[in-house]
Amino acid sequence: MIGLNHYLIVSGLLFCIGLAGMLKRKNILLLFFSTEIMLNAINIGFVAISKYTHNLDGQMFALFIISIAASEVAIGLGLVILWFKKFKSLDIDSLNAMKG
């Protein structure tokens, strides 16, 4: 039987993978992907704890995070597309060009 610890371990591993991606990558698009992995890891943790405590608060938080992540993707992807059209690069080091 899969217990709460298994879900929390998977959640923690996914969060660490996302955090490593945030710290190691220089591509803006990969930073967005890493952020989504981290948010999904948090969702797994919330839903697992919610299931084992028979409380719906964790599932409500997970739905809230999913809606926030969807808006982040919509706005962020639009900004990334505009950034690529203007500078022909998705490198995070080229963000210094935005300084006024």
Swiss-Prot record:
Signal peptide range in chain numbering: none
Transmembrane portions of the chain: 1-21, 28-48, 64-84
Catalytic activity: a quinone + NADH + 5 H(+)(in) = a quinol + NAD(+) + 4 H(+)(out)
Key words of the record: Cell inner membrane, Cell membrane, Membrane, NAD, Quinone, Translocase, Transmembrane, Transmembrane helix, Transport, Ubiquinone
Any one Pfam family match given in the protein's UniProt record, by short name: Oxidored_q2
EC number: 7.1.1.-
Subcellular localization: Cell inner membrane
Similarity remark: Belongs to the complex I subunit 4L family.
HAMAP family: NDH1_NuoK
Function, in words: NDH-1 shuttles electrons from NADH, via FMN and iron-sulfur (Fe-S) centers, to quinones in the respiratory chain. The immediate electron acceptor for the enzyme in this species is believed to be ubiquinone. Couples the redox reaction to proton translocation (for every two electrons transferred, four hydrogen ions are translocated across the cytoplasmic membrane), and thus conserves the redox energy in a proton gradient.
Oligomer status and interactors: NDH-1 is composed of 14 different subunits. Subunits NuoA, H, J, K, L, M, N constitute the membrane sector of the complex.
Protein name (Swiss-Prot/TrEMBL): NADH-quinone oxidoreductase subunit K
Native source species: Helicobacter pylori (strain ATCC 700392 / 26695) (Campylobacter pylori)
Gene: nuoK
